[in-house]
Curated annotation (Swiss-Prot):
Keywords: ATP-binding, Magnesium, Nucleotide-binding, One-carbon metabolism, Transferase. The keyword Nucleotide-binding applies. Pfam families: AdoMet_Synthase (PF01941). GO terms for molecular function: ATP binding; magnesium ion binding; methionine adenosyltransferase activity. This is S-adenosylmethionine synthase. Its cofactor is Mg(2+). One of its GO terms (biological process) is one-carbon metabolic process. Catalyzes the formation of S-adenosylmethionine from methionine and ATP. Pathway: Amino-acid biosynthesis; S-adenosyl-L-methionine biosynthesis; S-adenosyl-L-methionine from L-methionine: step 1/1. Its EC number is 2.5.1.6. Belongs to the AdoMet synthase 2 family. ATP binds at residues 136-141. PANTHER family: S-ADENOSYLMETHIONINE SYNTHASE (PTHR36697:SF1).
Length: 400
């Protein structure tokens, strides 16, 4: 069946030429991102368990988790946790199939423990966190929609949509690169740099201002003087990363709420504000491209934790982003591209109600010149939509 792919030209000012642009990222140790990461790690673990036992992924959604802040007493040289962080795992998972009981709660708790150990090495998992799994079972009608049919494309679990865009702007690129640099390189040299980092980017004309909140781990920081040295180091390193991706002026402001005189600063025991006063929820942070982009169309769906078989809130957000990025790479003449995929509940996921593509051609290029190439890329990605499922299960696609 021919797919309903609609491609239209946009008539608007390109984002890079607009006066104001805002971009945000909540890094791995932010409470909202912790919730996202736990939810996704549980979904992946359930997928592996189902595949091992039954050769197929069974119905589940773990996209409703909460991180409830604990209480701590940080101090230079090393503080302590007073009350543990509470993690609530809820959602739905198939617990019995063909007479076999699946230990879904055990799988979920183990996955959460493993994920927290990986991203928050300063957190004592035996003492400083409580993990409570309250997974239920799904509604009968949605489980019926989910039922795999041999050789058939899965049917949409909902009437919903996914959104993606490309290419990334200077500010978007800077924030993604800064987060990756700190997580993969800088923290290895300086373990005092905590995992709870929030980066807010403002571009006002040709000036980019990065406002960064970064937790410092108290046991690796002796006093307020050393804390200030870390602030100077981070400001310098972030500035270096930023300037690799733009010719614009870059200003870095770090931990702007600090009061150095009274020593009231962003100091933590574990590297995350979830240890005291900051709760987290799945879906309240980054979109599947790792960013929050109010200048762009966005879906409000939580991508993390949703099943990767037929949950449109996951599949179409990932797929629309993939389509936009692939089109930018392969088709010359695209300034900006936005993709929106809309499903109908119960219909095959490779047949969206509409695949809407909005293109801002570069100067001197008409939509007619590039329409055919874009159409082919969209159609091919929809025909191979189940590849998204495989990539998600293997952990190859990020969801936040």
């Amino acid at each position: 069946m021919k797919r309903n792919i609609q491609i239209e030209a946009l008539n608007q000012i390109p984002l890079e030429k607009q006066r104001i642009e805002l971009v945000e990222r909540k890094c791995l140790g932010h409470p909202d991102s912790i919730a996202d990461g736990i939810a996704e790690s549980i979904s992946q673990a359930l997928c592996r368990e189902y595949l091992k036992e039954f050769g197929a992924v069974l119905h589940h959604n773990t996209d409703q988790g909460e991180v409830v802040a604990g209480e701590s007493c940080p101090k230079f040289g090393g503080g302590k946790m007073i009350r543990p962080i509470y993690v609530l795992i809820d959602g739905r998972a198939t617990k019995q199939f063909n007479g076999v009981t699946i230990p879904t709660d055990t799988v979920a708790v183990e996955a959460a423990h493993e994920y927290l150990h990986k991203i928050l090495p300063e957190l004592n998992l035996q003492r400083d966190v409580m993990i409570d799994s309250r997974l239920g079972t799904g509604s009968t009608d949605l489980r019926d929609v989910f039922k795999p049919r041999q050789g058939k494309v899965p049917r949409s679990n909902d009437t919903s949509f996914g959104v993606g865009h490309a290419p990334f702007s200077d500010v978007e690129t800077i924030i993604r690169n800064t987060s990756e640099y700190i997580d993969t390189k800088l923290r290895k040299k300086y373990p005092a740099i905590g995992q709870d980092i929030k980066i807010m980017g403002l571009r006002d004309g040709n000036t980019i201002t990065l406002t960064v909140a970064c937790a410092i781990v108290d046991r690796y920081c002796a006093d307020i003087r050393e804390y200030q040295e870390y602030m100077g180091l981070l400001t310098e390193e972030i500035g270096k990363v930023a300037k690799k991706s733009t010719k614009r002026k870059v200003v870095v402001n770090l931990n702007t709420a600090d009061d150095i005189k009274s020593k009231s600063v962003f100091l933590t025991v574990t590297g995350t504000s979830a240890e005291m006063g900051d709760d987290g929820s799945v879906g309240r942070g980054n979109r599947c491209n790792g960013l929050i982009t109010p200048n762009r169309p966005m879906s409000m769906e939580a991508t993390s934790g949703k099943n990767p078989i037929n949950h449109i809130g996951k599949i179409y957000n990932l797929l629309s982003t993939q389509i936009a990025q692939e089109s930018i790479k392969k088709v010359d003449g695209i300034e900006e591209m936005y993709v929106r995929l809309l499903s109908q509940i119960g219909k095959p996921i490779d047949q969206p109600l509409v695949a809407s593509v909005q293109v801002l051609p570069r100067k001197g290029v008409t939509l007619q010149e590039i329409n055919g190439e874009i159409q082919a890329i969209v159609d091919d990605n929809l025909a191979n939509v189940t590849s998204i499922t495989e990539k998600v299960i293997r952990g190859e696609l990020k969801t936040f």
